Amino acid sequence: ARICFKNNLPFQFLWMSQQAIEKYIKCILIFNRFPVKNIGHNLVAGIKKINDIPYIKLDLSDKSIYFIEYLNDQGPNRYFQKVMYTNGFEIITLDRTVWELRRYCRLLNYQLKTPKGELIDMLEVELRKIEHSRNVPPHKYKITDGYLEKRLKDNKYNHGNILTWKNLYFGKTKKNTIKIGRS
């Protein structure tokens, strides 16, 4: 999606953005042992299903919620069956939405066994990690052994550069501003 945006391919950008967000939504459901059947490409239905998980209070900004609804409408329009529109700043909102969803892409409700055989519930610890992530600069949030973190580190296939291009939420350093030209 990021490459499509960079190369001024708005139709493809929207479709790939929709696909990316769909994968994050389904990842959250799978990690939390909830079925992903009957969602298809419907992002709003996926978010509804996540909100049905009793211990998850999905903390998404209004901009991300709006963007998910926008992608739900525009993303599947890859065959140009209806009017497509963009405002030119979708890359920023995609990055924000990915960052907000990605924090939940982990096993949350599990137990660890101590050497003494005691079981420790980790749900509260994991939920606190998610809550705490809002209090640190976004670029400092890392998923241990995460795919994006690996690509940022090794820059294999130039992925690190693609991931960090005009990305306020992911990278090695904090970005306060970015410039986006509009055509």
Segments and roles (model prediction):
Residues 6, 25, 82:
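Residue-level marker of positions within ordered structural domains that often coincide
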Residues 19, 27-28:
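Contiguous, well-ordered alpha-helical segments that form the cores/surfaces of helical PPI scaffolds
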Residues 1-14, 28, 32-35:
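Charged alpha-helical initiation segments
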Residues 29, 33-182:
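Long, charged low-complexity segments
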